[in-house]
């Protein structure tokens, strides 16, 4: 559950735009493996008290449904992606069944072949596999996520409610066997903190790499939503999302779009609610989320991101 402040009592949140501005003004220009240089900063923290609103960026519209109606909004695609990974999705077909359609450029036959994967397969080192089928020395995959929820319910005061997307042998290169994932996990290091006395739940999230104008927009949706979801199924009130980024960057071909977004006025964050009838984390779907009080300053716009 979550208790939002009335919309007119919320304070406009500038943390996302502050990060964009920091990268623009102090970022170091570096080469990347994508062939496009980037400005980057190392180490950035944000804290979102969820009573002040759900962190959906207002610098551009991500919740408007496409005019053709064939696919969900970007907001609901992000939620579909989250629900897919929470259920162990590993292929583009799996993701599309949950309503996420943006993985196509990373799962082409040519790209997958580089890592010994069939077309459409994100690989055994991807998020869904790590969350639900983490490999073990004993040979039996370990379901991190299910055990995490059970542990929160059984031992709420424990300090090790943690989740990791990182399976080193499938991600790191330079070892026998090679990489087995189309994109090394950029996000997904989660630590859940429960105050059993106050009945509140805070989630801290670490992201190793953030494409600030594009990927980060949807990652903020992911982990704010996950905070609400875990709180609902374990019986706590969602309190705060604490967000840490190791490497935050803007590609040089995104600079014009970023400057346009920064020219907008800061807005209050919207209200996002969940279907209160859902009591199983793995039963959530994108359609169980509703957004209101969302007032973006720019229409939906496509921003380049290297593959």
Tell me the role of every PLM-derived stretch.
Residues 1-307:
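Terminal, non-catalytic protein-protein interaction segments that mediate quaternary/complex assembly
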């Amino acid at each position: 559950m979550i208790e939002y402040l009335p919309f007119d009592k919320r304070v406009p949140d500038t943390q996302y735009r502050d990060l964009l501005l920091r990268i623009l003004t102090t970022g170091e220009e570096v080469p990347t493996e994508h062939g496009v240089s980037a400005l980057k900063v190392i180490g950035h923290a944000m804290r979102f008290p969820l009573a002040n609103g759900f962190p959906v960026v207002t610098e551009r519209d991500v919740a408007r449904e496409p005019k053709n109606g064939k696919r969900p909004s970007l907001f609901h695609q992000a939620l579909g992606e989250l629900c897919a990974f929470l259920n162990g999705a590993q292929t583009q077909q799996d993701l599309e069944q949950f309503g996420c359609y943006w993985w196509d450029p990373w799962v082409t036959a040519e790209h997958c072949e580089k890592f010994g994967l069939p077309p459409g397969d994100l690989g055994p080192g991807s998020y869904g596999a790590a969350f639900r089928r983490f490999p073990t020395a004993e040979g039996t995959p370990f379901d991190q996520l299910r055990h995490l929820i059970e542990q929160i319910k059984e031992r709420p005061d424990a300090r090790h409610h943690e989740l990791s997307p990182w399976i080193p042998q499938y991600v790191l290169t330079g070892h026998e066997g090679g990489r087995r994932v189309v994109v090394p996990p950029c996000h997904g290091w989660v630590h859940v903190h429960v105050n059993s006395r106050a009945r509140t739940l805070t989630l801290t999230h670490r992201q190793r790499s953030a494409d600030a104008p594009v990927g980060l927009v949807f990652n903020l949706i992911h982990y704010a939503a996950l905070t609400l979801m875990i709180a609902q199924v374990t019986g706590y009130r969602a309190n705060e999302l604490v967000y840490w980024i190791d490497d935050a960057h803007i590609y040089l071909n995104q600079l014009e779009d970023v400057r346009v977004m920064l020219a907008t006025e800061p807005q209050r964050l919207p209200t996002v609610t969940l279907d209160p009838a859902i009591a199983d984390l793995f039963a959530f779907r994108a359609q169980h989320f509703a957004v209101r009080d969302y007032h973006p300053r720019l229409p939906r716009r496509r921003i380049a991101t290297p593959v």
